[in-house]
Design a protein with these regions (language model features):
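Short, flexible, basic/aromatic active-site loop/helix in glycosyltransferases
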Residues: 130-150
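Short, well-formed alpha-helical segments that are part of the catalytic scaffolds
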Residues: 7, 11-25
Length: 292
C-alpha cells in the first residue's frame, strides 16, 4: 500500500519544520509528502533536504480547500492520503497503524485518530510539550477499537483515494480561507461509498498554534455561514447545524464577558451577529469573509 501525507500550510514555517521531523521519525515512513504552502515563505526548503522520503511542493490559491485539493490531485497515484495539520504531531506508529487498519478492512474510506491532547482549546502548546504528552501517553497501544464516526477531525484524517477520484468528491472551494467544517462536508459526501471510522490506535497531539489562524471576526461569521451553507447543499442536517451554531454563539457570548487572551471571543461574536443579520437579509454567504 502506498500512503502519502499531505499538509496544507500557511504562516507556520517553524512549526511545520518540527512536524516534518516527527514524520521522519515514523516507524512506517510516508511514501511521499505533499506540501501545499500559501506562500513561498511558508516552507524551509533547506530543511527538506534531509528527510527520508520524497517531497513535492504543490502550488494552489491560498485557502484550506484549494490547497488540499491540489494535494489530492498530486497524490493520485497513491492508495491513501493522510492529511495532517501543520501543528499536529503524530505518534511514531501512526502511519503503521493506518496501513494495518486500511489493509484489514477495505470498506473503510475515511479514518481519523485519537487526539491525546488538543491545544486548540487553550493557549496552544510548544513542540516540547507535545512531545512530552506523546511520551507520557498512558495508553500508547490500547486494545484496538474501530468505531463509526460522523466525520474525521481535520487535523488528522486519512482518505482512501479511489472513491475521491472516481466520484470527483473534493473539498468545497466555496468555503474560503480557513474553510471551517470542510472536513465534515467532505466526509459526509464520501459516506455513501464506505465506512467513516475513528481508530484509537491512531494517536497524536494537536498543538493548536495560534499563528496563521483566521481573525475572530471572520471565524465568527463562518460559525454561522458555513453550517447553513452545508445544510443548503445537503451534506449535513439542520439539527446538526443548529446545535453547532447554538453552542458557538453561547460560548462567544459567555466568553466575551472576560475573554481569554488566546481567543478573540468578542470578534467571533461580532462575526456571529453580522452573519445573522445577513441571514435575515437573505445575503448570507461563506465567501463574505474574504472582504472582512
Amino acid at each position: 500500500m502506498k500512503i502519502a501525507v499531505g499538509v496544507a500550510t500557511s504562516g507556520r514555517r517553524k512549526i511545520l519544520a518540527c512536524m516534518i521531523d516527527r514524520l521522519a521519525a515514523q516507524t512506517r515512513k510516508p511514501d511521499h509528502l505533499f506540501l501545499s504552502p500559501a506562500t513561498d515563505e511558508d516552507i524551509d526548503m533547506e530543511h527538506l533536504r534531509s528527510v527520508p522520503f520524497p517531497v513535492s511542493i504543490v502550488s494552489s490559491p491560498k485557502g484550506s480547500c484549494p490547497q488540499r485539493n491540489a494535494i489530492i490531485n498530486a497524490a493520485a497515484g497513491m492508495d491513501a492520503l493522510t492529511f495532517f495539520d501543520d501543528d499536529f504531531f503524530p505518534a511514531a506508529n501512526y502511519l503503521a497503524e493506518t496501513e494495518a487498519l486500511l489493509e484489514a478492512d477495505e470498506t473503510i474510506v475515511v479514518a481519523t485518530g485519537h487526539v491525546i491532547f488538543d491545544g486548540i482549546h487553550g493557549p496552544g502548546l510548544q513542540a516540547g510539550e507535545a512531545d512530552r504528552i506523546i511520551r507520557e501517553d498512558p495508553t500508547p497501544d490500547p486494545a484496538p477499537a474501530v468505531v463509526p464516526a460522523h466525520n474525521a477531525y481535520g487535523c488528522n484524517m486519512t482518505f482512501r483515494l479511489q472513491p475521491i477520484l472516481a466520484h470527483r468528491i473534493f473539498f468545497d472551494e466555496e468555503l474560503p480561507l480557513y474553510a471551517w467544517q470542510e472536513d465534515v462536508d467532505l466526509c459526509r459526501r464520501l459516506s455513501p461509498y464506505g465506512k467513516i471510522v475513528a481508530f484509537n490506535r491512531l494517536r497524536g497531539v494537536h498543538l493548536g498554534v495560534k499563528a496563521g489562524r483566521t481573525s475572530g471576526l471572520r471565524f465568527g461569521y463562518s460559525q454561522i455561514a458555513n453550517p447553513l451553507y452545508l445544510v443548503k447543499k445537503g451534506s449535513v442536517s439542520l439539527k446538526w447545524a443548529l446545535r453547532l451554531m447554538g453552542g458557538n454563539i453561547a460560548s462567544n457570548i459567555i466568553g466575551s464577558i472576560n475573554p481569554p487572551p488566546y481567543v478573540d471571543r468578542r470578534g467571533r461574536l461580532r462575526g456571529n451577529l453580522i452573519a445573522l443579520r445577513h441571514l435575515l437579509l437573505g445575503a448570507l454567504d461563506p465567501r463574505h469573509i474574504t472582504n472582512m
